[in-house]
Amino acid sequence: MKQPSNWIEGMSMELKKKKKLAVCVPFRDPGDGVRDKHLAEFVPYMNQFLSERGFDFKIFVAHQCDDKLFNRSAMKNIAFDVAREEGYDYFAFHDVDMLPEDGADYSYPNEHPVHIFTNLSQWDYRLRDIEYFGGCVLFTKEQFENVNGYYNDYWDWGMEDDDLFWRCY
Protein backbone atom coordinates (compact mmCIF):
# COMPACT_ATOMS: atom_id res chain seq x y z
CA MET A 1 0.00 0.00 0.00
CA LYS A 2 1.33 3.40 -0.94
CA GLN A 3 2.11 5.62 2.04
CA PRO A 4 1.10 9.29 1.89
CA SER A 5 4.00 11.60 1.13
CA ASN A 6 2.59 14.52 3.09
CA TRP A 7 -0.17 15.52 5.47
CA ILE A 8 -2.57 16.74 2.73
CA GLU A 9 -2.24 13.53 0.74
CA GLY A 10 -2.79 11.55 3.95
CA MET A 11 -5.97 13.49 4.71
CA SER A 12 -7.18 12.92 1.15
CA MET A 13 -6.68 9.17 1.49
CA GLU A 14 -8.49 9.20 4.85
CA LEU A 15 -11.47 11.11 3.42
CA LYS A 16 -11.94 8.49 0.72
CA LYS A 17 -12.47 5.84 3.43
CA LYS A 18 -15.25 7.77 5.15
CA LYS A 19 -18.77 6.50 5.37
CA LYS A 20 -21.48 8.54 3.65
CA LEU A 21 -24.08 10.08 5.98
CA ALA A 22 -27.65 10.77 4.86
CA VAL A 23 -29.54 13.27 7.01
CA CYS A 24 -33.20 12.26 6.59
CA VAL A 25 -35.68 14.99 7.52
CA PRO A 26 -39.46 14.47 7.52
CA PHE A 27 -41.11 17.76 6.70
CA ARG A 28 -44.51 19.38 6.57
CA ASP A 29 -45.50 22.93 7.33
CA PRO A 30 -49.03 22.95 8.75
CA GLY A 31 -49.70 26.31 7.14
CA ASP A 32 -48.46 28.70 9.80
CA GLY A 33 -44.97 29.05 8.32
CA VAL A 34 -43.21 27.90 11.50
CA ARG A 35 -41.80 24.69 10.01
CA ASP A 36 -40.77 26.57 6.86
CA LYS A 37 -38.71 28.86 9.11
CA HIS A 38 -37.23 25.84 10.88
CA LEU A 39 -36.21 24.31 7.54
CA ALA A 40 -34.70 27.60 6.34
CA GLU A 41 -32.52 27.61 9.48
CA PHE A 42 -31.86 23.86 9.62
CA VAL A 43 -30.33 23.30 6.18
CA PRO A 44 -27.58 25.95 6.29
CA TYR A 45 -26.84 25.20 9.96
CA MET A 46 -26.44 21.47 9.32
CA ASN A 47 -24.40 22.08 6.18
CA GLN A 48 -21.95 24.18 8.17
CA PHE A 49 -21.99 21.93 11.26
CA LEU A 50 -21.29 18.71 9.37
CA SER A 51 -18.91 20.27 6.82
CA GLU A 52 -16.73 21.77 9.55
CA ARG A 53 -16.41 18.30 11.07
CA GLY A 54 -15.42 16.69 7.78
CA PHE A 55 -18.48 14.52 7.15
CA ASP A 56 -19.40 13.26 3.68
CA PHE A 57 -23.14 13.93 3.84
CA LYS A 58 -26.29 14.99 2.06
CA ILE A 59 -29.56 16.27 3.50
CA PHE A 60 -32.71 14.53 2.25
CA VAL A 61 -35.93 16.42 3.02
CA ALA A 62 -39.05 14.30 2.52
CA HIS A 63 -41.85 16.84 2.16
CA GLN A 64 -45.45 15.71 2.58
CA CYS A 65 -47.54 18.03 0.41
CA ASP A 66 -51.08 16.63 0.68
CA ASP A 67 -53.88 17.63 3.05
CA LYS A 68 -53.85 14.40 5.08
CA LEU A 69 -52.51 14.15 8.62
CA PHE A 70 -48.72 14.22 8.74
CA ASN A 71 -47.11 10.81 8.40
CA ARG A 72 -43.61 11.35 9.78
CA SER A 73 -42.87 7.62 9.56
CA ALA A 74 -43.58 7.46 5.85
CA MET A 75 -41.49 10.59 5.21
CA LYS A 76 -38.55 9.11 7.13
CA ASN A 77 -38.85 5.81 5.26
CA ILE A 78 -39.05 7.60 1.90
CA ALA A 79 -35.93 9.66 2.67
CA PHE A 80 -34.15 6.44 3.68
CA ASP A 81 -35.15 4.68 0.45
CA VAL A 82 -33.89 7.54 -1.73
CA ALA A 83 -30.63 7.87 0.22
CA ARG A 84 -30.05 4.12 0.18
CA GLU A 85 -30.48 4.10 -3.60
CA GLU A 86 -27.83 6.83 -3.79
CA GLY A 87 -25.38 4.64 -1.87
CA TYR A 88 -25.38 6.18 1.59
CA ASP A 89 -23.95 4.05 4.40
CA TYR A 90 -25.69 5.44 7.46
CA PHE A 91 -28.64 7.62 8.26
CA ALA A 92 -29.51 10.38 10.72
CA PHE A 93 -33.29 10.60 11.13
CA HIS A 94 -33.54 14.21 12.20
CA ASP A 95 -36.28 16.54 13.41
CA VAL A 96 -36.20 19.85 11.54
CA ASP A 97 -36.63 21.88 14.72
CA MET A 98 -33.61 20.48 16.58
CA LEU A 99 -30.09 21.69 15.94
CA PRO A 100 -26.98 19.99 17.31
CA GLU A 101 -24.60 21.74 19.65
CA ASP A 102 -20.86 21.16 19.97
CA GLY A 103 -20.26 17.65 21.17
CA ALA A 104 -23.04 16.04 19.14
CA ASP A 105 -21.42 13.02 17.52
CA TYR A 106 -22.69 12.03 14.08
CA SER A 107 -20.07 9.30 13.63
CA TYR A 108 -20.89 5.93 12.11
CA PRO A 109 -22.92 3.84 14.64
CA ASN A 110 -20.96 0.58 14.60
CA GLU A 111 -22.65 -1.62 17.17
CA HIS A 112 -26.20 -0.31 17.57
CA PRO A 113 -28.39 2.67 16.68
CA VAL A 114 -27.30 5.86 18.43
CA HIS A 115 -29.63 8.48 19.88
CA ILE A 116 -27.95 11.86 19.53
CA PHE A 117 -30.35 14.13 21.38
CA THR A 118 -30.86 12.58 24.78
CA ASN A 119 -30.29 15.81 26.69
CA LEU A 120 -31.61 19.00 25.13
CA SER A 121 -31.41 22.64 26.07
CA GLN A 122 -35.21 22.85 26.00
CA TRP A 123 -35.25 20.38 28.95
CA ASP A 124 -32.35 22.02 30.81
CA TYR A 125 -30.03 19.28 29.53
CA ARG A 126 -31.81 16.58 31.51
CA LEU A 127 -33.08 13.35 30.03
CA ARG A 128 -36.80 13.82 29.42
CA ASP A 129 -37.69 10.16 29.30
CA ILE A 130 -35.54 7.04 29.28
CA GLU A 131 -37.48 5.83 26.24
CA TYR A 132 -37.27 9.12 24.32
CA PHE A 133 -35.95 8.22 20.86
CA GLY A 134 -36.77 11.37 18.92
CA GLY A 135 -34.80 14.37 17.78
CA CYS A 136 -32.05 12.55 15.94
CA VAL A 137 -31.12 8.89 15.78
CA LEU A 138 -28.36 7.27 13.74
CA PHE A 139 -28.67 3.89 12.03
CA THR A 140 -26.51 1.94 9.65
CA LYS A 141 -28.32 0.70 6.58
CA GLU A 142 -28.31 -2.83 8.00
CA GLN A 143 -29.59 -1.77 11.43
CA PHE A 144 -32.50 0.14 9.90
CA GLU A 145 -33.38 -2.68 7.53
CA ASN A 146 -33.23 -5.21 10.39
CA VAL A 147 -35.97 -3.35 12.29
CA ASN A 148 -37.89 -2.84 9.03
CA GLY A 149 -37.82 0.95 9.27
CA TYR A 150 -40.50 3.11 10.83
CA TYR A 151 -44.04 1.75 11.06
CA ASN A 152 -46.11 3.69 8.50
CA ASP A 153 -49.44 3.60 10.33
CA TYR A 154 -48.70 6.45 12.77
CA TRP A 155 -50.46 9.60 11.62
CA ASP A 156 -50.06 13.11 12.98
CA TRP A 157 -47.32 13.80 15.53
CA GLY A 158 -45.71 11.19 17.73
CA MET A 159 -45.50 7.51 18.59
CA GLU A 160 -43.36 6.46 15.61
CA ASP A 161 -40.19 7.13 17.62
CA ASP A 162 -41.48 5.18 20.62
CA ASP A 163 -42.45 2.25 18.41
CA LEU A 164 -39.01 2.20 16.81
CA PHE A 165 -37.32 2.37 20.23
CA TRP A 166 -39.12 -0.75 21.40
CA ARG A 167 -38.28 -2.65 18.22
CA CYS A 168 -34.59 -1.71 18.53
CA TYR A 169 -34.19 -2.52 22.19
Language model regions located:
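C-terminal interaction modules of eukaryotic adaptor/scaffold proteins
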Residues: Q64
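Conserved catalytic core of nucleotide-sugar-dependent glycosyltransferases
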Residues: D67, N71-K76, F80-A83, Y90-H94, ...
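Short loop/turn motifs at secondary-structure junctions
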Residues: F55-D56, G87
